[in-house]
């Protein structure tokens, strides 16, 4: 995906292999990338993590020292567009305090792991019927 003039991506075959191996895959991607992944994996769980304010976003980008003024301006110019797509995500986490945000993401992962898919439910129901 082209993000602020740079190209990023995660090899699809790696992701498929990890999923096949039962590994939870976490992708740190922008909105454009997340929507592309969601088309291929609608059953995925999507978490929108955002800072508490634009001012805080600016401070964090500056503190990294990895963005030029031009790149930062371009990035900030897309913030409203990206936030307008927040309803495409399953969860939202405001990263005001890093530890709190990490714990919320962990809680989301744990909750999602507790969900049974239809085939698991069918298997359990069949076992119940066999045991009765």
What are these regions (language model features)?
Residues 25-30, 39-63, 95:
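Conserved phosphate-donor/acceptor-positioning beta-strand/loop module used by diverse small-molecule
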Residues 42-44, 56, 64-84, 96-100:
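Ras-like small GTPase catalytic G-domain
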Residues 14, 60, 104-107:
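Alpha-helical scaffold elements adjacent to nucleotide-binding pockets in ATP/GTP-utilizing enzyme cores
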Residues 1-25, 31-35:
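ATP-dependent small-molecule kinase phosphotransfer cores
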Residues 17-20, 38-42, 84-86:
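Conserved catalytic network of the ASCE P-loop NTPase/AAA+ motor domain
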Residues 1-5, 61-70:
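Flexible beta-alpha connector loops of hexameric P-loop NTPases
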Residues 33, 53, 100-101:
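Short phosphate-engaging motifs
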Residues 66, 81-132:
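NTP-dependent small-molecule kinase module
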């Amino acid at each position: 995906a082209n993000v602020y003039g740079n190209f990023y991506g995660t090899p699809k075959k790696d992701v498929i292999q990890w999923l096949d191996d039962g590994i939870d895959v976490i992708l740190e991607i922008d909105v454009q990338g997340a929507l592309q992944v969601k088309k291929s994996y609608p059953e995925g769980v999507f978490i929108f993590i955002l800072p508490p304010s634009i001012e805080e976003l600016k401070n964090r980008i500056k503190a990294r020292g990895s963005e030029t003024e031009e790149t930062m301006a371009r990035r900030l110019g897309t913030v409203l567009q990206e936030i307008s797509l927040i309803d495409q995500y399953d969860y939202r986490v405001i990263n005001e305090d890093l530890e709190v945000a990490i714990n919320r993401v962990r809680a989301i992962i744990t909750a999602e792991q507790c969900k049974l898919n239809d085939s698991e439910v069918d298997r359990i129901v069949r076992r119940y019927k066999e045991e009765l």
